[in-house]
């Protein structure tokens, strides 16, 4: 038995096919979803989506949003998403270093909050690459 996973951003469909299992980062922690999972709607945190296709695991960096699960269908609507295999490791590492530098230079609450979010997004992209290796 399989699940139909659809990952959408405001601009594109990132993923739309059948999967065996997923592990999703929510605001209350990670949840594993197998076929016949109880119906839920949940907020999606900035984090990694792990997708199992047969015996292979793939990763995707998600940038926050919402997910609806029911009737073996999972719809994930996020601000942005990138497959781990599509992320350039050097560019992701440079972005992480820039985000760390920007956080140390942040002045005031707003800049600190924005810098922290940028750092979380950058770390998630690097983590998506590292989970593939």
From Swiss-Prot:
The record describes the protein's role as:
Produces ATP from ADP in the presence of a proton gradient across the membrane.
Q: Quote the HAMAP family the UniProt record gives.
A: ATP_synth_epsil_bac (MF_00530)
Q: Which family does it belong to?
A: Belongs to the ATPase epsilon chain family.
Where is it localised?
Plastid, Chloroplast thylakoid membrane
**What InterPro entries does the entry give?**
ATP_synth_F1_dsu/esu, ATP_synth_F1_dsu/esu_N, ATP_synth_F1_esu_C, ATPsynth_dsu/esu_N
Q: Name one GO molecular function term.
A: proton-transporting ATP synthase activity, rotational mechanism
Keyword Ion transport on this protein?
yes
This protein's GO CC annotations:
chloroplast thylakoid membrane; proton-transporting ATP synthase complex
Subunit description: F-type ATPases have 2 components, CF(1) - the catalytic core - and CF(0) - the membrane proton channel. CF(1) has five subunits: alpha(3), beta(3), gamma(1), delta(1), epsilon(1). CF(0) has three main subunits: a, b and c.
- What this protein is called in its record is ATP synthase epsilon chain, chloroplastic
Q: Which UniProt keywords are present, listed alphabetically? A: ATP synthesis, CF(1), Chloroplast, Hydrogen ion transport, Ion transport, Membrane, Plastid, Thylakoid, Transport
How this chain sits in the membrane, per its record, is: Peripheral membrane protein
NCBIfam families found in the cross-reference section: ATP_synt_epsi
Q: Is the keyword Oxidoreductase assigned to this protein?
A: no
